[in-house]
């Protein structure tokens, strides 16, 4: 979503559509490519109405099963804390949420993915789950 609102409080389809359209336009402008049609409710907050609105707009909704407090740019976890939480909580079938605003995530990502591979995990794309 564009503003990352608590979408569970949005019941007006026009407001919901604008959130989705605005982020798609920004993505297109920034990357020069079309954004994939996936919806992740911010903060994991949603209503049945939201899920239906997303579906009506052609989005597939996904939730995460592994996340940690990485979104606060003013209170980033240490490398050790992040690595420990992420390796300790990984599980088969995990959908991992890592915010791109996290400096720590960027710094540990290569090491983290390597560790998960050493633990026997493989990685896939959301589109594989939709099919």
Predicted regions located by residue number:
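C-terminal domain-boundary segment and adjacent tail
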Residues: 104-131
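Catalytic cysteine-centered active loop of the rhodanese-like fold, especially the PTP/DSP P-loop
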Residues: 93-104, 108
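Metal-dependent polysaccharide deacetylase catalytic core of the NodB/CE4 family, i.e.
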Residues: 1-80, 84-97
């Amino acid at each position: 979503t564009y503003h990352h609102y608590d979408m569970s409080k949005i019941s007006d389809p026009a407001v919901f559509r604008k959130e989705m359209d605005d982020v798609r336009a920004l993505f297109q402008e920034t990357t020069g490519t079309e954004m994939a049609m996936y919806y992740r409710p911010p903060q994991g907050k949603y209503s049945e109405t939201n899920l239906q609105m997303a579906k009506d707009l052609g989005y597939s909704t996904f939730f995460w099963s592994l996340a940690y407090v990485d979104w606060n740019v003013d209170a980033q976890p240490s490398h050790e804390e992040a690595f420990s939480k992420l390796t300790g909580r990984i599980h088969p079938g995990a959908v991992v949420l890592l915010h791109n605003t996290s400096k720590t995530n960027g710094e540990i990502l290569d090491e983290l993915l390597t560790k998960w591979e050493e633990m026997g995990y493989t990685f896939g794309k959301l589109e594989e789950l939709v099919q």
